[in-house]
Each structure stands twice: as C-alpha cells, then as structure tokens.
C-alpha cells in the first residue's frame, strides 16, 4: 500500500522528491519506508523528520518533511558506524568482563572506541572481537532508545553499569541537560544521543583494523586507554571492495612514496609532526607556491611576511588563546632585562598578524578591498595518535590570505575567492569537488564569537555567494569556525576518498576585536568585513593528498625531474651531454644517466622514479640529431629533433596539463 490511514488524526508527509503522502498520526519511519517499497524498508537505517535524524521507530505526529536514511548516504554511514562502535563495545564486554568504555564515535572511515581494560589487546583479540560482533549481529537484537532524567542516568551508570566514564560525561559535559538518552541492546547499554540502527542484525561484515593508545578526553594528564578502530558494512561484498581500496591506498600512501621518491622526511630528532622537505619535495612545493603567487598577483593580492612567534596577548585579543589552547604548544615564558615576564606562542594562526598590518595605517573606503597574502608557517600541538605524515602535522604552511572589504563588496569578494579555489583544483586535476557550507549551531551560541544577528548576516552572505557561483552544496550545522561561517571544499581523489582542502571564511568578529576600520564616503569610521581564504589549505596537507591522488605520477610541470637522458652506449655520451645541456638551458629539470648499465635497466629505474620523459639516445639518434621519446607509463612516442622535443616539453610544462 502507498499510504497508511485509520481513524486516528492524519499527517501529511512530504518526501524528498516533493510528493506528499497521507498517514495516520504516529506513523513510524519504518512504516513510511515499507509503504514506499520493500527494498527501501530493508535498506532503511533511520530517517529524518524536518532534517533531524531519528530512529526508525520514532512516531511522526505532525505534518513533516521525511527522508529515509540508508547506508548509501554519509548520514547513513555515520549512523551505521556509530551503532557498530556500540556493537564492538558489547562484544568486548562479553569477552572481557570489567572493561569500561570512554568515547566511541563514528569517524570518516568507520569508528573507534576508547577502552579501559587491564588486558592489553592484540591482533588475536581483534579477530575474536570480530567473531563475537558477528555472533551478536546474528542474534538480531533490537536496539532500543530510553530517555531518562540525567540524575537517574547517573545512578544507572554508577550502580548498574558501574562505568565511571559515562558518569563523568553526565556530571560534566551534560551537566545542564535535564534529560538524556540511553540505548539498550540486550544486556548492553550506552549513553548516546542517537539515532541508531533498529537492530544489530543490520551489520553483516566486520573488520577491526588497528589498536592504539589514547588519553581519556584527550588530556595527557588523565588515564591512558586503548583505542580500537574498525569498520563495518551491510554486506560482505562491500567489505571486499573496501579491502581492495585499502590495498590501493597502501600503494599510494604518501609516506611510502615520499620516502621512495625523496620528497620529505620525518625524524624524532627534529620532532613528531615536523616534516623536512627534501630537494625533490621542495621543488614540488616551490612550483605550487610560484603558481599560486602568480595567479594571486593577477587578482590583486599583495604579499606580506610575519614572524613564527607572537606575544600571547595578541592571541588572547583574537580569541585563538585560550579557544585553541588544547591544540597549541605551551607558551614560551621568559623575563626581559628589567625582570618583566613575557609570554610568546608559536604562531597558531596568521590572521592576527594580518589584522595588525591592516590597522597600521588609516584606510579609506576607496582603498578597499585590500587583499593580503602569505605562505605563513603555523604550529599546532596535534595529539601524537592523530599525526599522519604531511596530511596531519604539527608544523605546516598555509597559503593564507585575508581580504578586507566593505559590506557592499563582500559577496563579490567571496565569489572571487571561490573562483580562485576552483581554478586551483581544476589545474591540479581534482575534478570531483564537494562544497559544504559550514554554519554555526544556534543552540550552542556561546561556542562562537559575535552575536546571533552578526552570524545571521554572515551566513546569508555566504549562501548568496555560493548560489551566485552555481555551487551545489550541503549544510554542515556546527562546522563553522568560532569567528564565522565558511565554505569548505572537499575533493575526491583518484580512488574515491574525500579530503577537505581549501576554505573560504567570512568574519565579522575579528574586525570588532581588533577595532579595524576605514573612513567611509560620509567621513565616518566603518567596520570592514574580513574574508579568510586558503585554496590549498596547507601546503603539507595539499601535497600529501596530491601524492596519493597521482600515486606520485606528477604532471610534467610539477615533477621534480622532468626528463632523463639515457644514452645506450659510451660512444654517444658526448651527444647525450649536448642534449642534456640544451634541455637544462631551456629550464627543463633534467638528469643525465651515463652509467654503463643496459638501457632496459636504465628505463626501468626511470619508470620507478616516475620521471615523465625518458630520452633514449643511440647511434641512430646521434646521426640524425634526434632523440627517442619514451613517456612514463605510456611507452615509446617516436623520435623527435632536439629543438622540436624541447618545444613540446616546454609547451606541456607551461600549460600545466
């Protein structure tokens, strides 16, 4: 049947395609899915009521917009994996009685749970936990939500569950929440806001991937816990596809390729999360910086440089300290020659320095917009367990720009920043880009700087610019920075993984905190609006993603070595040197391999080094004044005169394709 009605009051349900259906009041999400189709009902994990996710058994008592959530959607995966973290905790509790549980969220690829347990988990334990999870799944236990007063929940987790971590959350994080929700599956229960799967039977395939250590609540002064990572799927087929992607990802791992290709290094002698660029990697980074600097110059940006440290009072004024204090290096404290104590921070953000540059002179409305740009290095004390080569580092360089404009210029400037970001991604071969409008959470206004009215205007401007640029976007409530909404660009790499890279942020808060102003046409002072903008995001993260996207097979303009001259025999070495000299003079990064190895070995080694152009020279090429061109991963492309070849390579390099 397409609709469900009885003598109860009726409700009108609007589906995602705009169609409307009539149901009896109290109809559940599952019943709505069943009325649409059997396959949808089988795939249903949860549903949304007016955009808010709910358990499938939640009754709908008023007219509403409803959407069924399946595993195919990001929301569905998050719910599936969050429920799976509970399933894993349930399995651990049965296998290791006395284990207690901290935080267990869904993450981008799966889930984890932090566990306090005297037993030290190992790989053998992971396999046992997987088996127990599948056993519990086969029981097809109902997952039921229970709401209770916070005080009752404290008593429940203190006396029945005997879980001090949940009690601490209830007494601290949720101290102002009168009613909380607990999810039960047979004898296991967990504190959670939900929603969750309707039953454990939805989970058909399990893979636990890693064990690491963590601190309770991320605080190094608190107890150490064991973190187990995993991922689950509604079918074995999806798990097999995931494992195949993991294998491909291992081949593309930027840490592995970074070492093999001599791009960067990490060493404890320098410090965790502090990458050192080796010559080949420095070439790639320099090419990217040169590319963006040239494009920014065309678009009216002016460069600045700022120090690597700053007085702590600067960051207190901006709000970065103490807002980001948990992820900052400790202040550097010393006494000057007068005995006065001063504190400095390793620069966590470039923004405050740029605001001071803007404010150092009186500005007129005619001067705006002013676009300051800097490749500025910043430092964040990321948890050691979160570090990941270049893509998550403690020291990294942002392609940071701040645009100071009048309110009437704001939407145009946002559009220009979006256009620049698109240009960068298109040039670098990121064809699939998602856009998220990251807005504030109005129910948690104290988390943000500025008033609700200021936020309303900023979010209106961001949406207007995104609509004008024809961007298809999704909304991320609670994803905004503390000073303003932002547009986040999320690229999909060659094997389908998503990476957040560039960003455009609107800021009405910092101009107030730094008392920024310009003289308007009326002769009075006015506040500018600030746009924070970084197409790359950070050079380290962007290059790390680029390495994995290309598998180290860089386009010619970025390749550290663009061509290698490979003479077949010693008798053509002099001619090979002449060819090498011409390429070098033309600005093509070239190597000359004069070793007495066989040409096949030279070619294989050049392929492994991922050099785009291999120029093979034998007696025949010398006599004709030519070279034989072999392209990386493509093979032979024929013989060319030296000047013709150089022109061909220079055109490819300069066009950046």
UniProtKB/Swiss-Prot annotation:
Compartments where located: Cytoplasm
EC number: 6.1.1.3
Electron transport is among the record's keywords: no
SMART domains xref list: tRNA_SAD
Main location: cytoplasm
Co-factor: note: Binds 1 zinc ion per subunit.
Residues annotated to bind Zn(2+): 351, 402, 532
Region (Catalytic): 253-555
Record's catalysed reaction(s): tRNA(Thr) + L-threonine + ATP = L-threonyl-tRNA(Thr) + AMP + diphosphate + H(+)
Catalytic class of the enzyme: ligase
GO process terms (BP): threonyl-tRNA aminoacylation
Entries under InterPro entries matching the protein: aa-tRNA-synt_IIb, aa-tRNA-synth_II, aa-tRNA-synth_II/BPL/LPL, Anticodon-bd, Anticodon-bd_dom_sf, Beta-grasp_dom_sf, TGS, TGS-like
Cofactor(s) the record lists: Zn(2+)
Sorted UniProt keywords: Aminoacyl-tRNA synthetase, ATP-binding, Cytoplasm, Ligase, Metal-binding, Nucleotide-binding, Protein biosynthesis, RNA-binding, tRNA-binding, Zinc
Pfam families, alphabetized: HGTP_anticodon (PF03129), TGS (PF02824), tRNA-synt_2b (PF00587), tRNA_SAD (PF07973)
GO molecular function: ATP binding; metal ion binding; threonine-tRNA ligase activity; tRNA binding
A GO CC annotation given for this chain: cytoplasm
TGS domain residues: 7-70
Primary role: Catalyzes the attachment of threonine to tRNA(Thr) in a two-step reaction: L-threonine is first activated by ATP to form Thr-AMP and then transferred to the acceptor end of tRNA(Thr). Also edits incorrectly charged L-seryl-tRNA(Thr).
HAMAP family: Thr_tRNA_synth
The family this protein is said to belong to: Belongs to the class-II aminoacyl-tRNA synthetase family.
Oligomer and partners: Homodimer.
UniProt name for this protein: Threonine--tRNA ligase
Gene this protein is translated from: thrS
